[in-house]
Design a protein with these regions (language model features):
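Phosphate-end processing signature that detects enzymes handling 5′-triphosphorylated RNA
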Residues: 1-253
Length: 253
């Protein structure tokens, strides 16, 4: 889709903050270093795919050198013309590689049935379809949060996001309805992410040090699994890659 970035390669650093730390940091960041992007505070909805026994996230939380996630993502209030992103996110030796396509809710339903979408990168569509066909995954966890995103005034490639009110559910597994859910963490921390295409500027390191903000390995989906899902019995149902009588991919919802 024109105007939508479909490939990313960057380093992402994560930090767990209190609300007081986040407010103080925001004041400093917006005092000449960064600006809030055009969307302001907005809701992000994610639908994570996994196996029935959560094999992908169980492997991921072991912190291997290579890990991968497949998810759907939507920004803001869901409407019929809302863009839905299908994303394959890989991390290797600390570098994040993300490949994605975008479409309307109806487009995404067709894509998940195995159709190819007009106007989207055909190579990326093949990569995503191949991954879905080779792995027995289906929608498992809906995860939402409120985000404020900032970009660097000198280096627009520098991105900082602050996410709050992290919540999840394992019912109504789509990105097209409400964003209700149960808090992942009872203390409701703020998750700061610094996304870098280049080296981190010195002023940012100094600000983080000033506010006693230190890097963490926090994973939203991983924390959700450990706090709420790890002791559940596997829910065995047909996989997203299984085919119906017409030979089309049947998306389990």
């Amino acid at each position: 889709m024109a105007g939508v970035q479909c490939s990313f390669e960057r380093v992402e650093k994560k930090f767990v903050l209190t609300h007081a730390q986040a407010e103080a940091l925001m004041r400093d960041l917006t005092a000449g270093y960064m600006a809030v992007d055009q969307y302001g505070q907005h809701t992000i909805r994610n639908l994570y795919y996994d196996t029935d026994d959560y094999a992908l996230i169980r492997k991921s939380i072991q912190r291997p050198k290579y890990k991968v996630k497949f998810r759907l993502r939507a920004y803001g209030t869901p409407m019929e013309d809302t863009l839905i992103f299908a994303e394959l996110k890989k991390k290797y030796s600390g570098v994040v590689y993300k490949r994605r396509i975008a479409g309307s809710p109806d487009d995404m339903r067709r894509f998940l049935r195995g159709e190819t979408l007009d106007g989207e990168n055909p190579q990326i569509q093949r990569e995503l379809h191949r991954y879905l066909s080779e792995h027995p995954i289906r929608p498992k966890v809906f995860l939402a949060y409120e985000r404020v995103a900032l970009y660097g005034l000198e280096d627009p490639e520098l991105r900082v996001t602050l996410d709050t009110h992290l919540r999840y559910r394992t019912t109504r597994l789509d990105c097209f309805t409400d964003d209700a859910g149960t808090l992942i963490c009872p203390d409701d921390p703020v998750i700061l992410e610094v996304k870098l295409a280049n080296a981190a500027p010195l002023w940012l390191a100094r600000l983080l040090s000033r506010h006693k903000i230190y890097m963490s390995s926090f994973s939203k989906y991983g924390t959700c699994y450990l706090n709420h899902l790890a002791r559940r019995k596997p829910d065995i149902r047909p996989m997203a890659h299984e085919r119906n009588n017409e030979g089309e991919i049947e998306h389990a919802s």
